[in-house]
A protein has these predicted regions:
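N-terminal lobe/hinge region of extracytoplasmic solute-binding protein
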Residues: 38-88, 183
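Gly/Pro-rich hinge or "lid" segments in bacterial periplasmic/extracellular proteins
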Residues: 75, 161-213, 217, 335-336
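Surface-exposed binding/hinge segments that line
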Residues: 85, 89, 96, 129-171
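Ligand-site clamp/hinge motif
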Residues: 206-251, 377
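Structural transition elements
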Residues: 279, 309-344, 362
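Detector for C-terminal structural segments
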Residues: 296-322, 359-368, 388-501
Length: 501
């Protein structure tokens, strides 16, 4: 998920503000050994339990090591884990651990430390902790652990390479201090933090993997405003910055290198949470949800709002096997058919749809116009905390830009009953049956078959109103090279390298 909004946690924010140096000077892209990133998000906790993907994960990669490293093309390689083996049924995993690694406070990394971290994560409540729920960890010997899963977890390696295994010192696990001051074994140490402004990291002396320590200092400069972030890149205040469709061409015209992820990491569209019709009875009607899909002119919308967006009516990525090209255009633009479906559902006169006030006003206006044409009135809910409230089940539907992970990750996140983007816990009989089959076996073939089935069900039952897949852009100065990361909005921290200029 790649939300572009800063979410505050007042207690944590206050503590983070007081950590580190005061009066920190604004970051400057000053020399060949430093890196300054213009970022759109900032962390609200350093506890690995709260680790998130997308724009957040580079923060955690600065101070923590994962057990497994995910390469830019989405493959896996050794990190704190030197090798691993997952059972054929995906219900157990044995991991050999690297020796000789210490945390920044001097504590030793070993099997006991790895178990303590995984136990803490599994017991915690965070954005993706549920992905390891039902997992028990046992120490085999000083440098080996074994994971045993209650149910098949074919994506266990993915989760251990992303949010599920950031290793903190066992001395600080489950302490309040970990929320504001990270203590890890990572390539960098947090030197200072000014909430709402910048986070400065210094290279950790004696770090075990110099290939991940390409800069002596890294600064994350928080710039939520798209124009401000562009200006910082153009003015030399940052070396690299996340760009939007509206700022890409300007950056190119000023001589900046723009790297695009042609794999289209995210999709943008409506997430119809209330498919049971408990909050808004109209959304409980299949015909209404299908009508909403027919009402949107995706090609025109993409041309008006984005750069090189890919119109689609499915949420699964074209990089996976669950994807079907035919599902990209399952719902053509057909307002006449939409009206017929509305009438069939008993809503010829329309209804009111409550949506979050999404940041792109031009997109909002166009969507509102398309829906008005079939007698659906949009009520834009003014809620500065809409993201958290949506996660808490308070919205019937939202406009959102959400990441397309691997097939099973997308399925677990979007169409599982307990998925992070199935906030009202909806489950149709067809989807329930597909999950029942998959839960019996974690074989690669069943994952392939059932995720494709789930994709088809979600489209036919109109769980979503996808608009298009979105390309992500990173602008860089001539001092830095950035390599895009598979299934992530921005490059991983390790994917930036100095050019020597």
């Amino acid at each position: 998920m790649k939300h572009m909004k800063r979410f505050s946690a007042s207690v944590v924010a206050l503590a983070l503000t007081t950590f580190g140096l005061t009066g920190v000077a604004p970051a400057q892209a000053a020399n060949k050994t430093d890196l300054v990133l213009g970022v759109v998000a900032e962390v609200t906790t350093w506890d690995p339990i709260g680790a998130n993907i997308g724009h957040y994960i580079p923060y955690y990669q600065a101070v923590y090591d994962n057990l497994i490293l995910r390469t830019p093309d989405g493959k896996y390689k050794a990190n704190l884990a030197t090798k691993w083996q997952v059972a054929d049924d995906s219900k157990s995993m044995t991991i050999d651990l690297r020796t000789g690694v210490k945390f920044s406070d001097g504590a030793k990394f070993d099997a006991a430390a790895a178990k303590a971290n995984l136990d803490s994560y599994i017991a915690g409540v965070g954005p993706y902790t549920a992905k390891l729920s039902g997992t028990t960890v046992s120490v085999v010997d000083s440098d080996t652990i074994k994971l045993t899963m209650a149910n098949p977890n074919p994506e266990i390696v993915y989760w251990l390479a992303t949010t599920g295994s950031f290793m903190a010192s066992p001395n600080v696990l489950k302490t309040a201090g970990l929320k504001t001051k990270p203590v890890g074994s990572g390539p960098y140490t947090l030197e200072s933090a000014t909430v709402g402004s910048q986070y400065v990291f210094k290279a950790t002396p004696g770090y075990w993997d110099k290939s991940k320590q390409k800069f002596s200092k890294i600064t994350f400069k928080f710039l939520s405003d798209n124009t401000a972030r562009l200006n910082a890149l153009l003015g030399g205040q940052v070396d690299a910055a996340y760009l939007t469709a509206a700022t890409v061409q300007v950056a190119k015209s000023k001589g900046k290198t723009v790297t695009a992820d042609a794999r289209a990491v995210d999709y943008k569209g409506l997430v119809l949470f209330d498919r049971a019709g408990n909050k808004n009875p109209a959304l409980g009607k299949l015909e209404v949800r299908q009508a909403l899909n027919y009402a949107i002119d995706r090609k025109a919308l993409a041309r008006a709002v984005e750069v090189n967006a890919q119109p689609t009516t499915q949420i699964f990525s074209p990089n996976g096997t669950a994807y079907s090209k035919s599902l990209d255009s399952y719902y053509s633009y057909n307002p006449t058919k939409a009206k017929e479906l509305m009438a069939k559902a008993g809503y010829a006169d329309g209804f009111t749809l409550n949506l979050n006030n999404w940041a792109e006003t031009n997109l909002n206006a166009l969507v509102e116009g398309y829906l008005k044409a079939i007698n659906v009135k949009v009520n834009w809910v003014q809620d500065t905390n809409w993201y958290a409230n949506a996660k808490g089940g308070k919205f019937e539907a939202i406009i959102m830009q959400i990441f397309q992970g691997t097939d099973l990750v997308t399925a677990e996140t979007a169409v599982a009953k307990d998925g992070g983007w199935n906030n009202l816990k909806y489950e149709s009989s067809a989807m329930k049956k597909a999950w029942a089959v998959l839960s019996q076996t974690g074989t690669a073939n069943q994952v392939k078959v059932q995720t494709a089935n789930m994709n088809r069900i979600a489209v036919e039952e109109a769980w979503f109103v996808p608009f298009y897949r979105v390309l992500h852009y990173v602008g860089t100065s001539n001092r830095v090279k950035a390599t895009v990361q598979a299934q992530n909005a921005v490059p991983y921290l390790y994917n930036y390298a100095p050019t020597g200029k």
